[in-house]
């Protein structure tokens, strides 16, 4: 499932784990802090994975696009 992930870049936060994950799944950078990701993870597993990659209090959102072009939007509480 394609997902658009976006977050606020905060000075002092380390995003290396996120960038490594994006590279591993061959994510596509759209803007400084927005990426297109294609993953087979369920919504729940995707959110869990993303939570593990960010620092507390980061603002993270994603949009999922199904193969039928249905959209799903959610804020991930970190």
Question: Which residues does each PLM region occupy?
Answer:
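Charged interaction segments
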Residues: 47-78
């Amino acid at each position: 499932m394609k997902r658009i992930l976006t977050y606020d870049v905060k000075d002092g936060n380390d995003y290396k784990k996120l960038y490594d994950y994006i590279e591993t799944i061959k994510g596509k950078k759209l803007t400084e802090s927005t990426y297109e990701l294609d993953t087979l993870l369920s919504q729940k597993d995707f959110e869990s994975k993303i939570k593990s990659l960010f620092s507390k209090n980061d603002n993270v959102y994603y949009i999922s696009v199904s193969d039928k072009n249905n959209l799903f939007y959610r804020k991930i509480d970190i």
